[in-house]
Amino acid sequence: MSEKSVLEKLQETNRDAEIWWDSSPLVFKNWAKNVVDRAPAEKKEVWKRQLGRLFDPENPGATQFKGVTTNPPLSLAAVKDNPGFWGDYIKNLIRENPGKGVEDVFWMAYKEIVKRGAQLFMPV
């Protein structure tokens, strides 16, 4: 049985094709963990290695993703993926910016989510 994932096999058909992560990079780690946790026992280790080749936050330049997509709904998924952290972050924004309204705080938080996700992909 081949260890290559479907996406690795697809990439072999066209080296110029780009595989993108169509979500916030901030959710990948938990998403991958959930996929592996739900995998059949005999496939867990293979899927873990395949997902590690797809994206490794420790070495993003050497992984399969060539880009990411983001927008407000995808950034909301990042907030929902780590609500404790982002809830505290937003409370702190409100505290540090007492004259700012809801929309201003939203945009400050949104830009931070996008920035942190982009930082994970900087070498790409």
Regions flagged by a language model, labelled:
Residues Q50-L54, A62-V124:
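Active-site beta->alpha loop and helix N-cap motifs at the rims of alpha/beta catalytic domains
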Residues M1-S23, K29-V36, L51-E58:
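N-terminal amphipathic alpha-helix/helix-capping segment at the start of soluble metabolic enzymes
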Residues W20-W21, W31, W47, W86, ...:
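A residue-identity detector for tryptophan
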Residues A17-E18, F28, K44, P83, ...:
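Intrinsically disordered regions, especially transient/low-confidence alpha-helical propensity segments
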Residues A17-S23, E42-V46, K66-T70:
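Hydrophobic faces of well-ordered beta-strands that scaffold small-molecule active sites
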Residues V27-N30, L76-A78:
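Flexible loop/turn segments at secondary-structure boundaries
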Residues F28-K29, A39, I94:
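Amphipathic alpha-helical interaction segments
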Residues R38-K43, W86-Y89:
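Short, low-complexity, polar/charged sequence segments that are solvent-exposed and flexible
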